[in-house]
Amino acid sequence: MGNLVIHQKVKAGLEEYEVKVNNVVKYKVKKKLIAVGADFDIFDAVGNKVGLVDQKVLNMVKTFDITLNGQKFGTVKKEFPALTKDMKYDYKGWKLDGDLLGMNFKFTNASNSVMATVQKKVVAFGDTYEVAFTDAQDELLMVALTVILDEAFHSKRS
């Protein structure tokens, strides 16, 4: 079981996320300045690039590719209708279900077991998410998936 706190910071129009484990920064996520769509680089605590979230802008539905440690980790697609807070993640067969306001999310596997939960917290500046997940190996993946759900459901461009 693992837990993360992911806090979005907006500085001079640039999006960044700080990811903490036990109140210590473990990852930083930075939106690429020049990109078509929403592309984010994920860095570990010492600045090594460990992941990428790449939005595909030519699709009818919001679609994001995930790459972690140089390996493709699948695609996440927002579901229709546009008012729902649901997404599908093809790599693990997971589904993301969100409540109507987009404040509480759960990731379930093909047998409908809950693999992770994400709760959006209301704070003054930026979005903050508390993430709990069942498999410690999914830590970096949960960073990428949480950034995707923030971009898909809480971005001003959504």
What are these regions (language model features)?
Residues 1-158:
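Intrinsically disordered, low-complexity proline/glycine-rich segments
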